[in-house]
Regions:
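Short alpha-helical donor nucleotide-sugar binding micro-motif in glycosyltransferases
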Residues: 140-145
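A short, active-site helix/loop in glycosyltransferases that binds the activated sugar's phosphate group
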Residues: 16-42
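Glycosyltransferase donor-sugar binding loop
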Residues: 100-115, 131-132
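Aromatic "clamp/platform" in nucleotide-sugar-dependent glycosyltransferases that forms part
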Residues: 153
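Nucleotide-activated donor-binding/catalytic signature segment of Leloir-type glycosyltransferases, i.e.
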Residues: 114-136
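Membrane-proximal helix-turn-helix segments that form the acceptor-binding/catalytic region
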Residues: 2-22
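Conserved donor-binding/catalytic core segment of Leloir-type glycosyltransferases
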Residues: 62-79, 85-88, 103
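Conserved acidic donor-binding segment of nucleotide-sugar-dependent glycosyltransferases
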Residues: 189-198, 206-210
Length: 250
């Protein structure tokens, strides 16, 4: 991740100051880039992605079903699947089997990282290596899950957080700037250190036992202009024209 970060910084720095505008997905990213490249914040347009989650998909989960955690991500090392797996393994060791399940959107065959994850934690009964999900299946799992876990170390915008938040259910998120901004306005959220599995494990145990008192609402921070919530507004800023219609950013 460190080498990738250095390469990314070098790539971005080439001709970056020659642009009239730069488009970013999040306000925290505007702050970082402005500081990193010594550019005015007014050169950055914040254009947050919009969710297309279907409100017609409802949960068919029975009341006495096992408590379900869900983590949706691609099998990349910065997604930090190992932290979620470690926490789940420790929780199963403490509570026993059939007390909860953690569903992952990888099956352990996608790449070397996924293979390593399955080798390390494929034997843990409470961890379900489901594999890739199409859009419909993903949204169905959002509806079925009791709680979203999102431990990713690096994101510009955590889209699964946006999508899951529409269900107004608990979320356990990495204590990082992207997660705070993406979850803004959500009412049942707790943040954990993305390097401490035992902290996540304790939160998972607490929520399984029906205690959500440690969770709270994430405050909404006003995003300064220039900011675009749809394509038309974005194009209007870029061309110095007035918006004429709405078109969601995806």
């Amino acid at each position: 991740i460190g080498l990738f970060g250095l390469f990314t910084r070098l790539a971005y720095s080439i001709n970056i100051k020659k642009n009239d505008f730069l488009i970013v997905q999040a306000d925290w990213l505007r702050d970082k880039f402005s500081y990193m490249f010594k550019l005015s914040k007014n050169k950055f347009i914040v254009a947050p992605p919009q969710s297309n989650t279907s409100n017609n998909i409802t949960s068919h989960k029975e009341k006495d079903d096992i408590y379900t955690f869900f983590y949706a991500a691609t099998p990349d090392c910065h997604k930090n699947f190992e932290l979620a797996c470690k926490a789940a393994q420790m929780l199963e060791d403490e509570l026993g089997k059939n007390r909860f399940k953690l569903i992952l959107t990888i099956n352990g065959t996608e790449n070397k990282y996924a293979q390593w994850l399955y080798t390390q934690w494929g034997q843990v009964d409470s961890i379900k290596f489901h594999g890739f999900m199409n859009k419909e299946s993903l949204y169905q799992h959002y509806a079925i899950a009791d709680c979203l876990i999102f431990p990713s170390r690096v994101e510009t915008w955590g889209l699964p957080i946006t999508e899951f938040s529409q269900h107004k259910k608990p979320m356990l998120l990495a204590d990082l700037p992207y997660a705070h901004e993406t979850a803004a306005g959500s009412s049942q959220v707790a943040f954990f250190n993305p390097e401490k599995a035992e902290q996540l494990q304790k939160m998972m145990k607490t929520i399984i036992n029906g205690n959500t008192s440690f969770m709270g609402e994430v405050p909404v921070k006003k995003i300064e202009e220039p900011m675009a919530k749809d394509w038309d507004t974005l194009f209007a800023i870029l061309t110095h024209n007035k918006p004429t219609k709405n078109a969601k950013l995806i």
